[in-house]
A protein has these predicted regions:
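Internal alpha/beta core interface subdomains
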Residues: 1-16, 21
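Extracellular polysaccharide-degrading/modifying enzymes targeting complex plant/algal/animal polysaccharides
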Residues: 1-5, 69-71, 161, 165-169
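Short glycine/acidic-rich loop motifs that flank beta-strands on beta-rich extracellular proteins
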Residues: 8-14, 30-38, 46, 50, ...
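Short "repeat-start/strand-capping" segments in structured domains, especially the N-termini
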Residues: 17-21, 44-48, 79-80, 101-109, ...
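Long, well-ordered mid-to-C-terminal structural blocks that present hydrophobic/aromatic surfaces
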Residues: 102-140
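C-terminal structural cap/anchor segments
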Residues: 134-174
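Conserved small/polar residues in nucleotide/adenosyl-binding loops
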Residues: 175-181
Length: 181
């Protein structure tokens, strides 16, 4: 398959795309490289990520749906996402929702993956001002092997410091979040 390597920032950024498949790829960056997310799907519908090997310095997959303006204007969540049989190594989060999720993330499944030596397994990042229309729902993690993962699951409700207006108080709501044992 295709290899994407040594990107100075986000490696792959599917944006407002529908019914896309990413199969048998390698996404490689040095583990000390900042802001080198492997894949940042934003406001996507019908995304499949299958058999992808990630080894990098930031989040392996970071789901997004708009930071401020685009998320509030179009209100298109990322939805119907299927991640399976992927290997995620080194990075801050193996699969991260946010922090740019102004329109939410819905119907995501991550199955039969390996997370190795990441700081976090599943990470949800929210931030004031990025959530008036945001709902995170129907998230399923199943048959995940974590080895050397410092924190398997974490929700950061106040990711970063403050937003430009300094006083936004919106919150993201979570429903049907499942982590089977």
């Amino acid at each position: 398959g295709l290899t994407v390597q040594n990107s100075p920032a986000w490696n792959l950024h599917p944006y407002f795309s529908n019914h896309t498949r990413w199969i048998d790829l390698k996404v490689l960056n040095p583990k000390q490289s900042p802001n080198t997310d492997g894949m940042d799907p934003e406001s996507v519908d019908g995304l499949e990520v299958v058999g992808v090997y990630f080894s990098l310095g930031d989040d392996c997959i970071a789901m997004k749906s708009g930071k401020f303006y685009m998320g509030h204007k179009y209100k298109v969540s990322s939805r119907n996402v299927d991640i399976r049989q992927c290997y995620m190594r080194h990075g801050h989060g193996a699969v991260t929702l946010g922090s740019e999720i102004a329109a939410g993330v819905r119907h995501l499944s991550c199955k039969k993956c390996i997370f190795e030596d990441t700081d976090r397994g599943l990470r949800v990042k929210t931030r004031r001002g990025r959530g008036e229309d945001s709902v995170v729902e129907d998230i399923l993690f199943e048959d995940i092997k974590m080895d050397g993962v410092l924190t398997p699951f974490v929700v950061n409700s106040y990711y970063w410091c403050c937003d430009p207006d300094g006083h936004s108080t919106y919150a993201v709501s979570y429903t049907h979040l499942t982590l089977p044992t």
